[in-house]
């Protein structure tokens, strides 16, 4: 790459540098010319004259070293032009023999390593010798004295002629400032006048070097007069060309004067584009695009407008860009939607495990599609925690229905124009992302995945969620209007699938979508997903062969329990990938194994080179990061096992109560939220209202305080579903009857002792099963939710729906406190015990809901 001054800053300001005043006239050279031995700075594409101040950019190593040597001495340097600007490493033969002695006025090192230097030409120098010395060019030469063989009157006449011509040149050349003439008026010396004018005329570099080499002032002035006169002739020729073009234009076309001038120049060069051919091509594309009649009319009107414009005008570029976008819309192109339900079902099952509700909805749509010719695409919203496969499910749906897939991330979008586009009046306007993606995919009926639709926001530029109201309304999206296209676009055949982590979506927008909830995966589902999909995927991704590694189901189960705490499977996949990477390293360090030493399993199949199981899992993943809750081993007074759920699943939650001397206060600890505190107050009121029936002293609060504590105090907790657990704990403390350790419970309590419904039942039952609980008491109103509980959970747990707190106490305490009454529901299904044990702790900092 060519360096400047190694090159100059171009333009008039390079020679008139207002920040640095030009020094006064220097005294005449001495009678004996000085013999110079100075660093040499080779120049490319520039000739520096005496009395000229110019900034230069220096980037070559030798040139920068020459400047360093000059700055270390008296700041003088020889500026010599190269014969060829393409020479990167010039030697003596590559330089002219006449240069300029210059003084360095200012030097600045730039961030990119180059140097910007301001120099002033002092005098002409004949360079006799150039050698390389200390990494720089060093030159020996002699200052050249100007000669004047002509009469002073003749020289003065030539100088006046030159000044007159240059004034004419400056007036017709807009690139030169008028202030330059004022500077020249103050110069009396003819030689200096010539050296000041020479850099400002647009002649070849060779002519400027020739001016530098001429020592006779009169001869130099005469050559300069000829060069300036020639430049004036060129300017007059340009003016005649402009006049000829202008005379050929009609009055209505005068506003396109500059564009017509460019056309005339192109015509002279024979380089005019085939504009009529392009217009015919656009007309053909419009006819073949299959546009609706109103759209085709709009396109033809824009094309006619384009024909009347100059091809080089800015407006023509806007119209041409608009037609390109309009023609890019797939007006009639579509893919054939697959109607084979069996193939679609197999495709969905091959990519995702579980998610039966979503798959059922897609198959229903395909079944109806096979009977109805014109059917609007469904608008689904998949709501679930991160990592459960919402986005990848959208890809599988597109694959199953044979639609093209388009993903549009809505996270962080604040501008309505991202959806509807910008109007064409704005510079750089574009269609919205819907139209852009339709053009990109080239299909009228793709699957649009609107990812993270709950992450949109609004600002002064508009509300993008409001713009989506028309897009996601099946009754309106057949005439969607983009601000840029300004024509109706039919989106009714597009299948929209939105994803969201929560229902924090504006109500009108949520109402237009069919919400399908995707809950977190159970432990069994995670195990199946890992063994079927994640392990084979990571084995392949890390360059392993199936016979080189075997990850057992017990290892996957331990990863789920002790190394991840999530609703989805993203971290599970990361841990599997970590194991695969360590196995790859282990195999690489061990080196190739001899064929004779390869073990063979009992069934004759080759045994895996590395086997990962629960016993050696810590070798690959380190110490366990999490523990899961487990049932207490012994029945205790005042300690009851409740159930809670978080964003990453269910948890066992202990509730402890005790009596301490006091004045009847209720003490609550364990980072309880407002709802949970109110639930504790309600529980105490229930106990006091039933005190006599339960055999409790009605005045038990006269000299005692009741302290209720929920362990794991660093974790905030809130919710009403620990109400019956608090009642049971208080009754146990007051009656001294232990609570069964194998019973867990969840339910809200009312002042009348009724057990109300709760949420998160599935997650809570999974936590109970995992923690070794045998019996779970749930509100009777949640009986309907048992249909969504996995079969293995309902089979291995004894789930008892209850309506009143009396039933809870009869089942949870070691011995009943109240006689059994007919009419109370006592449904107790027998079930085998489970042997799943662990430790009860929540993830630190996780807010627990009850």
Swiss-Prot record:
Induction: By heat shock. Residues 634-815 form the Lon proteolytic domain. Residues 38-232 form the Lon N-terminal domain. It catalyses: Hydrolysis of proteins in presence of ATP. One of its GO terms (molecular function) is ATP-dependent peptidase activity. This is Lon protease. Residues 819-850 are annotated as: Disordered. Keywords: ATP-binding, Cytoplasm, Hydrolase, Nucleotide-binding, Protease, Serine protease, Stress response. Pfam families: AAA (PF00004), Lon_C (PF05362), Lon_lid (PF22667), LON_substr_bdg (PF02190). The active site is at 721, 764. ATP-dependent serine protease that mediates the selective degradation of mutant and abnormal proteins as well as certain short-lived regulatory proteins. Required for cellular homeostasis and for survival from DNA damage and developmental changes induced by stress. Degrades polypeptides processively to yield small peptide fragments that are 5 to 10 amino acids long. Binds to DNA in a double-stranded, site-specific manner. It comes from the Bacteria. ATP binds at residues 384-391. Belongs to the peptidase S16 family. It is found in: Cytoplasm. Homohexamer. Organized in a ring with a central cavity. HAMAP family: lon_bact. Its EC number is 3.4.21.53. InterPro entries: AAA+_ATPase, ATPase_AAA_core, Lon_bac, Lon_bac/euk-typ, Lon_lid, Lon_proteolytic, Lon_Prtase, Lon_prtase_N. SUPFAM superfamilies: P-loop containing nucleoside triphosphate hydrolases, PUA domain-like, Ribosomal protein S5 domain 2-like. Residues 821-840 have a biased composition (Basic residues). GO terms for biological process: cellular response to heat; protein quality control for misfolded or incompletely synthesized proteins. Residues 841-850 have a biased composition (Polar residues).
């Amino acid at each position: 790459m060519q360096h400047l001054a190694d090159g100059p800053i171009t333009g008039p300001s390079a020679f008139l540098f207002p920040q640095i005043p030009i020094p006064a006239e220097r005294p005449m050279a001495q009678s004996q010319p000085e013999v110079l031995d100075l660093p040499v700075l080779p120049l490319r594409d520039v000739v520096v004259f005496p009395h000229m101040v110019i900034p230069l950019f220096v980037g070559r190593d030798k040139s920068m070293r020459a400047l360093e040597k000059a700055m270390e001495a008296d700041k003088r340097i020889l500026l010599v032009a190269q014969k060829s600007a393409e020479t990167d490493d010039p030697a003596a033969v590559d330089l002219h023999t006449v240069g300029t002695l210059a003084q360095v006025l200012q030097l600045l090192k730039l961030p990119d390593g180059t140097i910007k230097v301001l120099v002033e030409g002092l005098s002409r120098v004949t360079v006799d010798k150039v050698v390389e010395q200390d990494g720089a060019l060093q030159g020996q030469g002699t200052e050249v004295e100007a000669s004047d063989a002509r009469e002073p009157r003749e020289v003065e006449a030539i100088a006046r002629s030159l000044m007159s011509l240059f004034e004419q040149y400056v007036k017709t050349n807009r690139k030169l400032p008028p202030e330059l003439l004022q500077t020249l008026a103050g110069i009396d010396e003819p030689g200096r006048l010539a050296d000041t004018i020479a850099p400002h005329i647009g002649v070849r570099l060779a002519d400027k070097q020739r001016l530098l080499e001429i020592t006779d002032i009169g001869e130099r002035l005469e050559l300069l007069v000829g060069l300036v006169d020639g430049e004036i002739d060129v300017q007059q020729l340009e003016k005649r060309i402009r006049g000829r073009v202008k005379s050929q234009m009609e009055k209505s076309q005068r506003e396109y004067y500059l564009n017509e001038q460019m056309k005339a120049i192109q015509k002279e060069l024979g380089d005019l584009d085939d504009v009529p051919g392009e217009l015919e091509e656009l007309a053909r594309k419009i006819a073949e695009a299959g546009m609706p009649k109103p759209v085709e009319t709009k396109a033809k009107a824009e094309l006619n407008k384009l024909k009347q414009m100059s091809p080089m005008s800015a407006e023509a570029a806007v119209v041409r860009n608009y037609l390109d976008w309009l023609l890019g819309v797939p007006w009639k192109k579509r893919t054939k939607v697959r109607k084979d339900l069996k193939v679609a079902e197999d495709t969905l099952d091959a990519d995702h495990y579980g998610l039966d509700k979503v798959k059922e909805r897609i198959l229903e749509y395909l079944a109806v599609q096979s009977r109805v010719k014109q059917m609007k695409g469904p608008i689904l919203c998949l709501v679930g925690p991160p990592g459960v496969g919402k986005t990848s499910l959208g890809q599988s749906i597109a694959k199953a229905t044979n639609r093209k897939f388009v993903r549009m991330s809505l996270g962080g979008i604040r501008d309505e124009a991202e959806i509807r586009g910008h109007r064409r009046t704005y510079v750089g306007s574009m269609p919205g992302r819907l139209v852009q993606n339709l053009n990109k995919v080239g299909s009228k009926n793709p699957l649009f995945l609107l990812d993270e639709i709950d992450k949109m926001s609004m600002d002064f530029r508009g509300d993008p969620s409001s713009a989506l109201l028309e897009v996601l309304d099946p009754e309106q999206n057949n005439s969607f209007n983009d601000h840029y296209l300004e024509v109706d676009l039919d989106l009714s055949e597009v299948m929209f699938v939105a994803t969201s982590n929560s229902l924090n979506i504006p109500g009108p927008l949520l109402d237009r979508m069919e919400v399908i909830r995707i809950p977190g995966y159970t432990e069994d589902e995670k195990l199946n997903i890992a063994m079927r999909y994640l392990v084979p995927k990571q084995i392949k991704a890390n360059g392993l062969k199936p016979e080189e590694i075997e990850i057992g189901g017990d290892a996957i189960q331990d990863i789920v329990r002790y190394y991840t705490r999530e609703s989805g499977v993203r971290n599970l996949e990361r841990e599997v990938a970590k194991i695969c990477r360590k196995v790859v390293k282990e195999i690489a360090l061990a080196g190739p194994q001899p064929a004779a030493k390869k073990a063979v399993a009992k069934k004759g199949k080759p045994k895996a080179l590395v086997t990962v199981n629960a016993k050696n899992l810590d070798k690959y993943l380190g110490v366990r990061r999490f523990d899961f809750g487990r049932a207490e081993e012994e029945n205790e007074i005042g300690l009851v096992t409740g159930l809670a759920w978080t964003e990453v699943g269910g948890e066992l939650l202990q509730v402890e109560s005790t009596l301490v001397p006091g004045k009847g206060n209720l003490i609550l600890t364990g980072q309880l939220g407002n709802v949970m505190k109110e639930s504790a107050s309600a529980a105490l009121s229930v106990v006091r209202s039933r005190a006599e029936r339960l055999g409790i002293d009605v005045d038990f609060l006269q000299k005692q305080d009741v302290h209720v504590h929920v362990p794991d105090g660093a974790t905030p907790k809130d919710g009403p579903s620990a109400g019956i657990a608090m009642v049971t704990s208080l009754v146990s403390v007051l009656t001294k009857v232990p609570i069964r350790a194998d019973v867990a419970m969840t339910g809200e309590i009312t002042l009348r002792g009724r057990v109300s419904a709760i949420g998160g039942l599935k997650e809570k039952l999974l936590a109970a099963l995992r923690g070794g609980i045998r019996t779970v008491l749930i509100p009777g109103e949640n009986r309907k939710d048992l249909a969504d509980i996995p079969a293995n959970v309902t089979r291995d747990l004894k789930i008892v729906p209850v309506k009143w707190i009396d039933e809870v106490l009869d089942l949870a305490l070691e011995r009943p406190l109240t006689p059994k009454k007919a009419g109370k529901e006592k449904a107790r299904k027998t079930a085998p015990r489970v042997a799943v044990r662990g430790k009860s702790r929540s993830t630190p900092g996780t807010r627990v809901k009850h």
